[in-house]
Amino acid sequence: MHIQEFHQALADIGARPCHIGRINRAWLKGLPLDAGTRHQKSEDYFPLSVREGLAPIAARIEKLARIHSRHDADDGSLRLLVGLGDGQMVESVLLPRDGLCVSSQVGCAVGCTFCMTGKSGLLRQLGSAEIAAQVALARRIRPVKKVVFMGMGEPAHNMENVLEAIQWLGTDGNIGHKNLVFSTVGDARVFERLPQLEVKPALALSLHTTRADLREQLLPRAPRIAPAELVELGEAYARRVGYPIQYQWTLLAGVNDSQEEMDAAARLLKGKYGVLNIIPYNSVEGDRFQRPSSERVQAIKRYLHDNGVLTKVRDSAGQDVDGGCGQLRARAAHVIDASRLRRREQAGVSAG
């Protein structure tokens, strides 16, 4: 469902814009659609036709998304496996300090080699109301003051629905614009569209390396854009909107954590209006990638910080409960990594 469909359904039962606005705000707070306020009961505000017609609309909205399972983690995060109306599932993560990570697609077409979500490919887009429904569900559990589009999917590949959800969350959802974070691998359309929006979100760019050839290997179906050009575009956006870019770097032991890479990262990012989030890879059994040691991660952070790059370590939330993006859904949906299966079969043949 799209947000416009929701609004049209409300208009069809006689809701005026002022009524639709109140219903929007109630839903995005995680409240019933007919919730009143401290100063005015719903029966004193909504006309009879709206009060009588809300129940079937509320039932449709409830079917958009439901919590299939909850997984509490030791770090204070709460991973939610969210079931959609057609039986598909996506992940949302309630983060410490009132944040929420939401999904924008079922699966993903980019196929990042270190990401579980890409193993299944792209199954379908989420509608704007399905994206917002993740926020409504989460707010029934605890406050949400920041929403990051870093869950399943590439937001730029579902641009219209994501931007519609951002507009809604940044107005009726009462979330500050810089607390809405649009994450992308570097789709050129992002840098054209986002500056034109009324609600201009913060931007997170998937960098992962300073080497164009390695980035093509790690992100095989991402736009062919050199890391230096990506940073240049990010810097221009950051200066325009007035809040820093987040650069994402998933640390893979022996792949992109060398001293040579860190030297290049320092040269590329020093003095830029941004922060580098280094994310130690969330290893899974039998995977070809491994996370660097804690000592190496801290050494990288210190080195970059000492060389003029604001650097933070961002572990995937919920390391003890399938913390990497897509891992929880993969376990529930029995998603198989074909390359890992082939390696196991080859190992079995060799052993025989």
UniProtKB/Swiss-Prot annotation:
Annotated cofactor note: Binds 1 [4Fe-4S] cluster. The cluster is coordinated with 3 cysteines and an exchangeable S-adenosyl-L-methionine.
Cofactor dependence: [4Fe-4S] cluster
Family, as annotated: Belongs to the radical SAM superfamily. RlmN family.
Species: Chromobacterium violaceum (strain ATCC 12472 / DSM 30191 / JCM 1249 / CCUG 213 / NBRC 12614 / NCIMB 9131 / NCTC 9757 / MK)
Gene Ontology cellular component annotations, sorted alphabetically: cytoplasm
EC number: 2.1.1.-
Primary localization class, coarse: cytoplasm
Positions bound to [4Fe-4S] cluster: 108, 112, 115
Gene Ontology BP, a term: rRNA base methylation
Keyword flag ATP-binding: no
Active site: 91, 325
MF annotations from Gene Ontology: 4 iron, 4 sulfur cluster binding; metal ion binding; RNA methyltransferase activity
Domain Radical SAM core: 94-320
Matching NCBIfam families: PRK14464.1
Intrachain S-S bonds: 101-325
Coiled coil: none
Subcellular location: Cytoplasm
A Pfam family annotated for this UniProt entry: Radical_SAM
InterPro entries, per database record: Aldolase_TIM, Methyltransferase_A, rRNA_lsu_MTrfase_RlmN/Cfr, rSAM
EC main group: transferase
Protein name per its UniProtKB record: Probable RNA methyltransferase CV_2253
Keywords for this protein: 4Fe-4S, Cytoplasm, Disulfide bond, Iron, Iron-sulfur, Metal-binding, Methyltransferase, S-adenosyl-L-methionine, Transferase
Keyword Cytoplasm: yes
Positions that bind S-adenosyl-L-methionine: 153-154, 183, 206-208, 282
Domain of life: Bacteria
